[in-house]
Amino acid sequence: MQPSGWAAAREAAGRDMLAADLRCSLFASALQSYKRDSVLRPFPASYARGDCKDFEALLADASKLPNLKELLQSSGDNHKRAWDLVSWILSSKVLTIHSAGKAEFEKIQKLTGAPHTPVPAPDFLFEIEYFDPANAKFYETKGERDLIYAFHGSRLENFHSIIHNGLHCHLNKTSLFGEGTYLTSDLSLALIYSPHGHGWQHSLLGPILSCVAVCEVIDHPDVKCQTKKKDSKEIDRRRARIKHSEGGDIPPKYFVVTNNQLLRVKYLLVYSQKPPKRASSQLSWFSSHWFTVMISLYLLLLLIVSVINSSAFQHFWNRAKR
């Protein structure tokens, strides 16, 4: 009899394989990072030996994971350790992730404000749904306040922790305008902070990905930005600058959130690095064998010259001209 966790993982992967694949990819990226001790959080307890994390054993098992299509078609007994690991990756009491359609990206663009410059549409889009009590707590904090939607760019290796633990202001490394989580209404700016990184080699999304978070932010005074005072055209200076800011006022299009309870990730935009366009098979073969081809042509030319200069050819040619 298979463990109940396997059945739940099978059901989740079968229902939305791309979403399950994404979680495996984010896990793999964190595991491969040189900062794995800090970015791979949560960490599977079955690979913890007291206070030590057995990364070598985890890396060995993760490297043997087949792609999800193959795993779903196999019997659990043949991939016991794989199913144990995938079950852990897909389990969460706080949230679930769904793949979303292209229409959702148009909605996101409207929520964040129409882009001033052309922005690339994501190859894949995912929506995060939160369970209670986390969801109820967020809306309790929100109260009657509006929601702001903005983008957050980060390295791929950070997203395993981001989706499970949220964005934490004190962990932010960009502090020119003060301590906090930096977001922007401009997707092209967020993409600068989201370089492509190595994910999961067997991913259906692709082995090299870039990820941008779309966050819901409660419109609270602790969210610093360029905003006007209520019923006025004047900028609200209390919200335009953070105490001890080295760079002065928050620039337009940026938001700096100084309270962890005021934001959460709602969508993930995923960009897959396209393989370089291959030349035609003929050109590809020629580029690999150009030296042999040139020598062959040279020898053929010598043969032609030799034949032309031969007495037999000259005799035949002279007779043909008569």
Curated annotation (Swiss-Prot):
Coarse class of the protein's main subcellular location: endoplasmic reticulum
Activity control mechanisms: In absence of activation signal, PARP16 is autoinhibited by the PARP alpha-helical domain (also named HD region), which prevents effective NAD(+)-binding. Activity is highly stimulated by signals, which unfold the PARP alpha-helical domain, relieving autoinhibition.
Residues the record lists as ADP-ribosyl glutamic acid modifications: 70
Broad enzyme group: transferase
GO molecular function: kinase binding; NAD+ poly-ADP-ribosyltransferase activity; NAD+-protein mono-ADP-ribosyltransferase activity; NAD+-protein-aspartate ADP-ribosyltransferase activity; NAD+-protein-glutamate ADP-ribosyltransferase activity; NAD+-protein-lysine ADP-ribosyltransferase activity; nucleotidyltransferase activity; protein serine/threonine kinase activator activity
Assigned keywords, A-Z: ADP-ribosylation, Endoplasmic reticulum, Glycosyltransferase, Membrane, NAD, Nucleotidyltransferase, Transferase, Transmembrane, Transmembrane helix, Unfolded protein response
Known outcome of mutating residue 182 to A: ADP-ribosyltransferase activity is only 6% of wild-type
Residues with site note (Nicotinamide-stacking aromate): 193
Catalysis performed (reactions): L-aspartyl-[protein] + NAD(+) = 4-O-(ADP-D-ribosyl)-L-aspartyl-[protein] + nicotinamide; L-glutamyl-[protein] + NAD(+) = 5-O-(ADP-D-ribosyl)-L-glutamyl-[protein] + nicotinamide; L-lysyl-[protein] + NAD(+) = N(6)-(ADP-D-ribosyl)-L-lysyl-[protein] + nicotinamide + H(+)
Lumenal side: 309-322
Catalytic activity, EC: 2.4.2.-
GO biological process: cellular response to leukemia inhibitory factor; endoplasmic reticulum unfolded protein response; IRE1-mediated unfolded protein response; negative regulation of cytoplasmic translation; protein auto-ADP-ribosylation; viral protein processing
Domain notes: The PARP alpha-helical domain (also named HD region) is regulatory, it packs against the catalytic domain.
Record family assignment: Belongs to the ARTD/PARP family.
Subunit structure: Interacts with KPNB1.
Function per UniProt: Intracellular mono-ADP-ribosyltransferase that plays a role in different processes, such as protein translation and unfolded protein response (UPR), through the mono-ADP-ribosylation of proteins involved in those processes. Acts as an inhibitor of protein translation by catalyzing mono-ADP-ribosylation of ribosomal subunits, such as RPL14 and RPS6, thereby inhibiting polysome assembly and mRNA loading. Mono-ADP-ribosylation of ribosomal subunits is promoted by NMNAT2.
Name of the protein described by the UniProt record: Protein mono-ADP-ribosyltransferase PARP16
Origin species: Homo sapiens (Human)
Gene: PARP16
